[in-house]
């Protein structure tokens, strides 16, 4: 008799059946929605490890995970079958987490691989009937309408590489960050002096942010021209010369200690 490490006898019985390929094939042929079933080559069923570890290193475990080839033979589909003897208001979100974990593992060894379809299925036989909760995870939000707009569309993108500099300098306290990170790969940042002076004069960054900014330029930009860059910057804004030179000297000393 096969032993399963499970929390309940319900789980043990469920696994003893659904981990058998012929039984799993019958289950999917009967219960998978027709349009999804037609995508799957159920003769290619392969049992996969259903244990995962998420980013916080906590065990994430689903009951049963099968992979199948597509009928076109150009990819894989995974079917997650979760067993529940009690209803769970957040079951849909839990199934989404399982699905994301399967997708992550699929692309771990080759980031260029397309994401696989993962079909989550819930087998329920609890005392409360019918199953009382939606299995659309978007319904779990307090505002499902906004959740659908957010998660069914492309996410907001701030592509600073296509934003004109004249527009960036109007972005108040985030302008320095955006301007430098847009142009850092030029290596020579001397052409940005005029715009940087305007932003620094308006006190759009505190000492901590200016320190981080200059350190970033030293580490990522043209190190050989850093002193020239600082000299030109301070010559354009003599009222801030002492402040900037103090920060630059501290960065230089820290860099020397790190390299000694």
Curated annotation (Swiss-Prot):
Report the EC code(s) recorded for this entry. 3.1.21.-
Tell me yes or no: is Magnesium among this UniProt entry's keywords.
yes
Its BP terms in the Gene Ontology are: DNA recombination
Q: Which domain of life is it from?
A: Bacteria
Pfam family example for this protein? Answer: Transposase_31
List the InterPro entries hit by this protein, alphabetically. Answer: Rpn/YhgA-like_nuclease, RpnA, Transposase_31
Q: Which UniProt keywords apply?
A: DNA recombination, Endonuclease, Hydrolase, Magnesium, Nuclease
GO MF annotation list: double-stranded DNA endonuclease activity
NCBIfam families, alphabetized: T_den_put_tspse
- Give a short account of what the protein does: A low activity DNA endonuclease probably yielding 3'-hydroxyl ends. Involved in RecA-independent recombination and horizontal gene transfer.
Protein family: Belongs to the Rpn/YhgA-like nuclease family.
This one is known as Recombination-promoting nuclease RpnD
**Species assigned in the record:** Escherichia coli O157:H7
The upper taxonomy is:
Bacteria, Pseudomonadati, Pseudomonadota, Gammaproteobacteria, Enterobacterales
Recorded name of the encoding gene: rpnD
């Amino acid at each position: 008799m096969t032993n399963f490490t499970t929390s309940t006898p319900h789980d043990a019985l469920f696994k003893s059946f659904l981990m058998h390929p012929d039984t799993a094939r019958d289950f999917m042929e009967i219960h998978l929605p027709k349009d999804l079933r037609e995508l799957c080559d159920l003769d290619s069923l392969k049992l996969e490890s259903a244990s995962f570890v998420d980013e916080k290193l906590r065990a994430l475990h689903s009951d049963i995970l099968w992979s199948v080839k597509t009928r076109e033979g150009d990819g894989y589909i995974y079917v997650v079958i979760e067993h529940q003897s009690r209803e769970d208001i957040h079951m849909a979100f839990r199934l989404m987490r399982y699905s994301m974990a399967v997708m992550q593992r699929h692309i771990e060894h080759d980031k260029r691989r397309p994401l696989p379809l993962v079909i989550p299925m819930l087998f329920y036989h609890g005392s409360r009937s019918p199953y009382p909760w939606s299995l659309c995870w978007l319904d779990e939000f307090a505002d499902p309408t906004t959740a659908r707009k957010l998660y069914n569309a492309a996410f907001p993108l701030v592509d600073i590489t296509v934003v004109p500099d004249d527009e960036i300098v109007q972005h108040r306290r985030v302008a320095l960050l955006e301007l430098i990170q847009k142009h850092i790969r030029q290596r020579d940042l001397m052409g940005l002096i005029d715009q940087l002076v305007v932003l620094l004069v308006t006190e759009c960054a505190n000492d901590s942010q200016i320190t981080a900014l200059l350190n970033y330029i030293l580490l990522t930009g043209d190190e050989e021209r850093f002193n020239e860059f600082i000299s030109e910057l301070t010559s354009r804004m003599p009222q801030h010369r002492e402040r900037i030179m103090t920060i630059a000297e501290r960065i230089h000393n820290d860099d020397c200690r790190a390299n000694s």
